[in-house]
């Protein structure tokens, strides 16, 4: 399955794991799902470490625009994007954060330690 969507209500966390091949439309459906499930303020970790190529800039723009339309200006939870440590993917990750603008909290995560630190800050395990 190219996109795996896991929801953890206790941690207020959604984990979206992408693998090849997936389409932009499939990814946009995950955003629609989050809105429909009333989990817009949950932390979302997009794990793209198993994806072989960087998302084209035009698709990044469509992703950001779709998110803004679906969210209708409502505050969104923090977004973490785990990427493979490759220069072209890092460039696209930074481009995504820039396109999203200052109203969106997007962190690009390069390694497991950064992913774990992000999860600790934004989706701690509760007793």
Regions found by a protein language model. Give the residues of each.
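Amphipathic, Lys/Arg-enriched alpha-helical "gate/interface" segment within cytosolic domains
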Residues: 1-127
């Amino acid at each position: 399955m190219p996109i795996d969507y896991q929801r953890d209500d206790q941690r207020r966390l959604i984990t979206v794991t992408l693998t090849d091949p997936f389409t932009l439309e499939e990814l946009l459906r995950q955003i629609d799902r989050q809105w429909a499930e009333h989990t817009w303020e949950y932390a979302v970790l997009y794990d793209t470490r198993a994806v072989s190529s960087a998302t084209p800039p035009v698709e990044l723009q469509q992703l950001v625009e779709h998110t803004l339309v679906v969210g209708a200006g409502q505050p969104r939870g923090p977004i973490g994007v785990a990427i493979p440590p490759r220069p072209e993917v890092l460039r696209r990750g930074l481009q995504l954060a820039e396109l999203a603008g200052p109203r969106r909290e997007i962190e690009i995560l390069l390694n497991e330690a950064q992913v774990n630190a992000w999860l600790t800050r934004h989706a701690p395990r509760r007793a």
